[in-house]
Amino acid sequence: MRTSSGRPEGGQGTQDPAPTNGHDGPSDDGTGAAPPPTAARRPRVTWRKLTFLPAALIAVLLATWLWFEQADLDALTRNALSDGQVSKALWQHIELTAISTFFVLIIAIPLGILLTRPRFRRAAPAAMALANMGQATPAIGLLALLVIWLGIGRRAALIGIIAYAVLPVLSNTIAGLKANDPTLLEAARGIGMSPLGVLTRVELPLAVPLILAGVRTALVLNVGTATLATFGGGGGLGVLITTGITSQRMPVLVVGSILTVALALLVDWLASLAELLLRPRGLEAGP
């Protein structure tokens, strides 16, 4: 029986159809047709990560500069820090780090890929042993041997830095490729991918986080090891450090040391940002 308004009396009879629009229907009681809310994701790179370390480095460098402006420096100290000597040493250090890292990447990553292929897996222990020898040898001793062999110059310094930094990238490349899920690789082969396609589209993207971690370690190692290039005639910030030690001029030593530490921290910060930004999406949740 219907009332004069056309509605069923006493709640009996047919009811009005439920609204089909997700904005009109219930969304919180779990019975409506509205889609479940998606979980909010934290940004992969926060403002704190972007600004804290650079701000701290700028503050330290500014404090160092203000101290030098007010310090009473003798003629020898001023000569060691003037006429573009500091900028020249810093630029040489950056060049040594960049060139050595480039060669580390083009040597260690392809070699790591090669040593994970079935035909060359037996050679992996020997290659890792050589890489371990390169890093286990004291850097100053290795540089001295290279200077005896190649002579004084940047080439000996670069080879020593490269030999010292190959291990982390090589070992992380091998570990990253070996850690891939075999079922994913079989699925890729099952849909008709070639071996090269499996490597470039499945294996390497999954191994990117570990490879980038190795590259980050190698970068910091290169910045530190490049200070020893001065003993082989390679230049760099080590020139300021050794000059400050031999001449007993603490300000020169402080400048070389602070710039080396600041450059290492800056390189590590840039590498950490690259590690976050270049990581394939979906491999890890959160930053």
Language model: regions and residue ranges:
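Membrane-embedded alpha-helices of multi-pass transport/permease systems
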Residues: I107-I113, A156-L185, V208, V215-V223, ...
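Cytoplasmic-entry segments and transmembrane alpha-helices of multi-pass inner-membrane transporters
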Residues: L111-L146, S171-A179, E186
